[in-house]
Amino acid sequence: MDSGLSSSLMQFMLRDHEADTDRLNQILSSSDDAGLVRRMPPIPFTGDIESMQQGDCACLLGINPLWPAPGKPAHETELRPAMRLIKRLRAGDRSAFAEYMRTRMTYFSSGIANWGHFDKVGHGYAEHFFTSEDKRSVWESHAFAMDVVPYFSRDATSLDRGRIVEQVSSDPALRHHQRILAAVIAEARPSVLHLNGSHAIQVVEALYCDGPLERQGELGSQYGLRFGEARIGGTPVRVFAHNQFGYGRYNPSKKHWPAFARAWADWT
């Protein structure tokens, strides 16, 4: 990992995340409570960004990480260990930073991955973009994930899109995270930036595109499928975007991958 990126990541994890979430909860929601979990540190990235195939990988960008329901294994396997490591780091134990980075790098290989979330994406990647892989092996060197807002919440509906677009380039924590995003993109050089949901779409369009992404016919009208190009911190990247995966009328599911992939092939 580039030393500049490593230093930026450490400084980000040393931030007072409780103060950051208190502030963000007020400014990212019209109700003065965006629902961000104040006791949980942010996650800057997910996946082995050092092992990515430069120019032949995907960066999945979503809105923010989901806080699991009570009793879910992630509380014991991922979240509480992360809280302990960051507490050690902020107490002066710099070795905890290396341990924490390993947990993020090995997320998909250490048995803690939330495959219920990542399989629907990995399925499409393996079937249509990185065909030598399967839906899980694709995360080893061809895909990693980040979020626009790197703080957990149970329900992202309280996060106001317009406020996020305003704050992502002005709030000190979100601005720092955008610098990390740019550095990771520069290091991994993904062949596609995959935007899952309108929050990520609006942020990328506002900050990194010359204009709106191009909607793709009927798929664009119903599922928000749109393509385009962005430049993040000086690194050009093609953008593949759609409404958030889900179960609503306007939310795509894994059955839409073949049509999405055909549209992408035609566009590129």
Q: Predicted regions span which residues?
A:
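Active-site and ligand/interface coordination hotspots across diverse enzymes
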Residues: 1-114, 174-180, 184, 232, ...
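Charged, often glycine-rich, active-site loop that binds/positions anionic groups
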Residues: 141-173
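A structural signal for short, well-ordered beta-strand segments and their strand-loop junctions
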Residues: 58-62, 137-147, 192-197, 241
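A substrate-binding/cap region within the structured catalytic cores of diverse enzymes
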Residues: 97-143
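A short helix->loop->beta-strand "cap" motif at the edges of active sites that frequently abuts
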Residues: 56, 189-191, 232-238
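C-terminal capping/extension of enzyme domains
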Residues: 1-34, 164-182, 201-268
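Proline-aspartate-enriched helix->loop->beta-strand connector
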Residues: 181-196
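Short, solvent-exposed loop/turn segments at secondary-structure junctions
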Residues: 64-68, 149-153, 198-202, 244-248
